[in-house]
Design a protein with these regions (language model features):
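Alpha-helical scaffold domains
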Residues: 1-200
Length: 200
């Protein structure tokens, strides 16, 4: 049903242009992001449970359709996700993390990061897991360590704990200097530029 809703909004001409822009063979429907966001908001309202959203997001991601993957990320992009029982928002975090090895381009990587960053801020102890990504051989997983942690670069008045987290992330950035991959360098400059705007 969710895929049917996305397909009704398909725009083949827009899809062709988007495929060329993103340089991808992945199926694209040509649905603008604001329309995807509106659909995701509606689905979230229909079933606000973590289990329901995680199940739908997982199914959408597995279609491999570009807009379906954007919608999957949008379903899990909110500051507060109240989970049932002791697991809390862990299923949402685990799902987003499971997407990392399947990422193959910056656009979907950034949508996944929007969802993941909120879960990371909700539970900063997950930085332990994120640190492991800095040693990954997979470009988009390694890049995710910087992009998921951007909220710490945006803080205007960081607490002592957040300053420690910021220093930790900056140490990862320092370790990326030797990596000549363009997307890695761009993620570092993005982080530093964001930080300098608030903490020159």
């Amino acid at each position: 049903r969710a895929m049917a809703a996305l397909r009704t909004l398909a725009d083949p001409e827009r899809a062709a242009k988007a495929s060329a822009y993103h340089k991808t063979d992945r199926e694209m429907l040509g649905v603008p992001v604001p329309e995807i966001t509106a659909l995701a908001d509606g689905w979230r309202a229909e079933d606000p449970t973590v289990a329901g959203r995680v199940a739908l997001a997982s199914a959408l991601w597995e279609t491999e359709v570009f807009e379906a993957r954007v919608a999957a990320a949008k379903l899990l992009t909110q500051a507060r996700i109240r989970g049932e029982g002791p697991e809390g928002d862990r299923p949402a975090w685990d799902l987003v993390v499971s997407w990392l090895p399947t990422l193959d381009g910056w656009a979907l990587a950034d949508h996944a990061a929007d969802a993941g960053a909120r879960r990371l801020v909700a539970d900063p102890s997950r930085l332990e897991e994120v640190e492991g990504w800095t040693r990954s051989d997979h470009l988009w997983t390694k890049r995710a360590a910087m992009v998921f942690t951007l909220p710490w670069a945006k803080l205007n008045h960081p607490s002592p704990e957040d300053r420690e987290r910021r220093e930790r992330i900056l140490s990862w950035a320092a370790g990326y200097v030797a990596d000549r991959e363009w997307f890695i360098q761009k993620s570092v400059s993005w982080w530093l530029r964001t930080l300098s705007a608030r903490d020159p």
